[in-house]
Regions:
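A recurrent flexible, glycine/aromatic-enriched loop bordering the glycosyltransferase active site
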Residues: 127, 140-160, 175, 181, ...
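A short, conserved alpha-helix in the catalytic core of glycosyltransferases
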Residues: 154-157, 161-166, 172-199
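Short aromatic/hydrophobic "clamp" motif used to bind/position activated sugar donors
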Residues: 90
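The conserved acidic donor/metal-binding loop of glycosyltransferases
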Residues: 94-98, 171
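Short, acidic, metal-binding catalytic loop of nucleotide-sugar glycosyltransferases
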Residues: 25-35
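Glycine-rich, basic loop-to-helix element that forms the pyrophosphate-binding segment
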Residues: 68-85, 153
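Conserved donor NDP-sugar-binding/catalytic core segment of glycosyltransferases
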Residues: 101-133, 203
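Active-site-adjacent helix/loop segment of glycosyltransferases
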Residues: 194-335
Length: 344
């Protein structure tokens, strides 16, 4: 006798982008057990009166539930979604991914292979890059998702593990680090995190010339991670350190040059300015070297390489101020009452 199909719900936070239709179309294709429900959390601002722009395939029409997310970010939106779903497994998908062929069947196999102590199973993520040329800086940044750990682009959690950990921490306001934070708490609660066999593609989203500058807001979230999980959180979350130490040094050199110039110390200003210029040039060269080296990309790298270090340091400083004295993640007793984690 074959084992019964696993019961699961799908939760997708969305801003109503057109790519949501692509996710739903991929979910409807192939074979395998259907989810009990597909919860779309509408995370647009609450004052937006328009209905969520979505085209639901006929096969999913009876399963779709659209709930308001109030525009408080993906962590809060995912909490809104999974708390509405009683199923034992919650599959989180981003609204800009493309689940692979036969995704439902592959998910069922991943869940069937999960042991009683498995709290979460991550998909294998791929990032398609344009053929025939080197990827841009933004494309390479997105490609890093293929090797990232515990990203909720496609990650299924056991509901009892979510209850045990208290869900996503809504103090993470953007799609950055909120997934690693939850995974560390699930692991700390004694659950295992594994990688399954199902596959999902994460296409590169179109982005403006300043996307890499806006991404520096994540440095404030890194401060929150250190406050919550200790200074070695990167090792446990398998998150590379990145260039922040170099950004801090370059920013310090630039600030020193400006101060020296303002106080009439020309020699000190020249020395500090030379250090700033050398650091900025090295950063730009490191970003240009693996890229397509078109005129547009070259100018974009030169300009943003000068701007990124001080912006990164600024967000880090804001994070220090905002998260000073921060406490552990709050566990919602109303979610946990009457439920047990289901492992030893």
């Amino acid at each position: 006798m074959s084992a019964p199909d696993p019961e699961y719900a799908v939760v997708i936070p969305t801003l109503g982008r057109a790519c949501l239709n692509r996710v739903l179309a991929a979910l409807a294709e192939g074979d395998g057990p259907w989810p009990a429900r597909v919860i779309l959390v509408d995370d647009r601002p609450p004052h937006d009166p328009r209905p969520l722009p979505v085209e639901v395939p006929g096969e999913l029409a009876a399963l779709i539930e659209i709930v308001p997310g109030c525009g408080r970010g993906p962590a809060a939106a995912r909490n809104t979604g999974w708390r509405r779903a009683p199923e034992p497994w919650i599959a989180f998908l981003d609204d800009d991914v493309v689940p692979g062929p036969h995704w439902r069947r592959a998910l069922a196999a991943d869940l069937a292979a999960a042991g009683g102590g498995t709290g979460g199973v991550q998909a294998r993520i791929s990032v398609p890059l344009p053929p025939g040329r080197r990827p841009t800086d933004w494309e390479r940044s997105t490609a890093g998702l293929a090797t990232a750990s515990w990203i909720t682009a496609d990650l299924v959690y056991r509901r009892s593990a979510l209850l045990d950990a208290g869900g996503f921490d809504e103090r993470f306001p953007r799609a950055f680090r909120e997934d690693a934070d939850l995974a560390l708490r699930v692991l700390a609660a004694g659950w295992e995190m594994t990688v399954g066999e199902r596959r999902t593609a994460h296409p590169v989203r179109p982005a403006g010339p300043w996307a890499s500058v806006r991404a520096q807001a994540g440095n404030a979230d890194d401060v929150l991670m250190a406050r919550l999980h200790g200074r070695d959180w990167r090792r446990r979350a398998r998150a590379p350190r990145g260039r922040f130490p170099a950004h801090a040094a370059v920013t310090a050199a630039g600030a020193a040059a400006l101060v020296a110039l303002g106080t009439g110390r020309r020699r000190a200003a020249l020395m500090s300015g030379a250090l700033w210029l050398a650091g900025t040039a090295e950063f730009a060269a490191a970003r240009i070297r693996p890229g397509p080296r078109t005129g547009t990309e070259l100018w974009r790298m030169v300009l943003t390489s000068a701007v990124i270090p001080p912006v990164a340091v600024g967000h880090w400083a804001l994070g220090l101020a905002r998260h000073r004295g921060v406490g552990p993640h709050p566990v919602f007793k109303s979610d946990i009452s009457g439920n047990s984690p289901g492992h030893g």
